[in-house]
Amino acid sequence: MATETERVGAKGGMEHSFGFTRVDETQKQSMVDSVFHSVAENYDKMNDILSLGLHRVWKNSMVAWLSPPALSHWKVLDVAGGTGDIAFRILKASRQKAHATVLDINGSMLSVGKQRAQKNGLAPLIDFVEANAEHLPFEDQSFDAYTIAFGIRNVPHIDQALREAFRVLKPGGRFLCLEFSNVEMPWLDKIYDLWSFHAIPKLGQFIANDGDAYRYLVESIRKFPKQNDFAHMIKQAGFSRVSYRNLTGAIAALHSGWKI
């Protein structure tokens, strides 16, 4: 099942969506990187804008559903987690017993995360790795859990990233993904569209001097597969007991799968 609408471009390469714009697959990753280099210092503010502050509640729900144990040998891989926001929450929930590896393709995001880890005294419990979610630099069966929050929609080949998640998880390991989703309440959908397409780019220009980056982030949400379609993709990658929970009228959704 395709991760997004793809077609062959004029030069023979596969075309992908960069928001609502068609681009060659060789261009998409560099364009996404440019967006996140631009917003790295204001990433939490960006999520506050995109979610009206609700991302903090959703992330707490994600960690609560994961329920990390207070065990020193328990290891979690947080992908596209450069600023450390999810990893810090997981470590707190494990009473600082677990070990987290934060992976991101964007060095600017990782720099923010490293600074925050040092500031919060968590650096000994976290490894920061700059790498691609489609080609994880880890051996098979290395982690007890794989988390990704608001990142998988920016991966050019989502199906490949899901296969890599399955590969690096231990048997019995857990996959959890938090992502903006398909709003299912008609009245809420209209309100959120008005906020997203009209207010957010203007606020992005005001806060980060980059309205185009925020416009891409809004458009990328609309291009992401609907909940049932994404759940099917997770199953296709090999996961069992796949389920999802809608959050706040399905503005976001939590997807779960197990490696059995």
UniProtKB/Swiss-Prot annotation:
Coiled coil: none annotated. One of its GO terms (biological process) is menaquinone biosynthetic process. It catalyses: a 2-demethylmenaquinol + S-adenosyl-L-methionine = a menaquinol + S-adenosyl-L-homocysteine + H(+); a 2-methoxy-6-(all-trans-polyprenyl)benzene-1,4-diol + S-adenosyl-L-methionine = a 5-methoxy-2-methyl-3-(all-trans-polyprenyl)benzene-1,4-diol + S-adenosyl-L-homocysteine + H(+). GO terms for molecular function: 2-methoxy-6-polyprenyl-1,4-benzoquinol methyltransferase activity; demethylmenaquinone methyltransferase activity. Keywords: Menaquinone biosynthesis, Methyltransferase, S-adenosyl-L-methionine, Transferase, Ubiquinone biosynthesis. Pfam families: Ubie_methyltran. CDD domains: AdoMet_MTases. InterPro entries: SAM-dependent_MTases_sf (IPR029063), UbiE/COQ5_MeTrFase (IPR004033), UbiE/COQ5_MeTrFase_CS (IPR023576). Pathway: Quinol/quinone metabolism; menaquinone biosynthesis; menaquinol from 1,4-dihydroxy-2-naphthoate: step 2/2; Cofactor biosynthesis; ubiquinone biosynthesis. HAMAP family: MenG_UbiE_methyltr. Belongs to the class I-like SAM-binding methyltransferase superfamily. MenG/UbiE family. This is Ubiquinone/menaquinone biosynthesis C-methyltransferase UbiE. It comes from Bartonella tribocorum (strain CIP 105476 / IBS 506).
